[in-house]
Swiss-Prot record:
It comes from Histophilus somni (strain 129Pt) (Haemophilus somnus). SUPFAM superfamilies: S-adenosyl-L-methionine-dependent methyltransferases. Specifically methylates the adenine in position 37 of tRNA(1)(Val) (anticodon cmo5UAC). Keywords: Cytoplasm, Methyltransferase, S-adenosyl-L-methionine, Transferase, tRNA processing. It is found in: Cytoplasm. It holds the Pfam family MTS. It catalyses: adenosine(37) in tRNA1(Val) + S-adenosyl-L-methionine = N(6)-methyladenosine(37) in tRNA1(Val) + S-adenosyl-L-homocysteine + H(+). Signal peptide: none annotated. InterPro entries: SAM-dependent_MTases_sf, Small_mtfrase_dom, tRNA_Adenine-N(6)_MTase, tRNA_adenine-N6_MeTrfase. This is tRNA1(Val) (adenine(37)-N6)-methyltransferase. Its main location: cytoplasm.
Amino acid sequence: MAKKQEFTFKQFHINQDQCAMKVGTDGILLGAWANINQANTLLDLGTGTGLIALMLAQRSPEHCHISAVELDPQAYLQAKDNIQQSPWANKIKIFQQDIIVFAQDCEHKFDVITANPPYFKQGIDCASKQRNLARYTLTQSHLDWLNAAEKLLNLTGEIHLILPFEEGKSLQKKCGLFCIRECKIITKAGKTPQRLLLSFSREERKCEESQLVIYDRNNQYSTEFKTLTQDFYLNF
């Protein structure tokens, strides 16, 4: 089934006909869950439609500065347009660049960094090179993404990611940062976790563990999911 070419939230609108990766639950979860308390500078890596950057802009105080990075030229232009049409056009700056190159060249450090990185390993080719680029882990691993984020992170900053469950568990063992929050995402009550929301820091502290169920046993959105995302979804 074809996904919608546009998506309207309570305070902003997303056009996505030029983006390989459309608005999805993963991005909405991350944008709503990431801890941005006391953050002044925020960065979204691989911004796609600009969804997470816009969610962070909605959630953060007016004085905050948000940067977003997107490699694909079509997605970059559409994200830029989505941002310009939003209430936070002066709050968000977007860059068309590879995240590894951006991490090497950028002189600024950030208090909060978010990323919803590609997660399907290369197998059957996607219908377009654009979607291939957006969806598959081709040349950059999840560890590459985390390492790039670490280079851009303030000493007391936090990195927030969403990943498939097994990949998220594997990344925790490989990286040199401390996992300080972990939320298991369960699509439907009674099922096993499919995703992990993760927060990393340079500072060691006890990891806060939780879980979130999206649909209850009656196939209705759970109270916890609606509570987390109610500032964004029109029907909550």
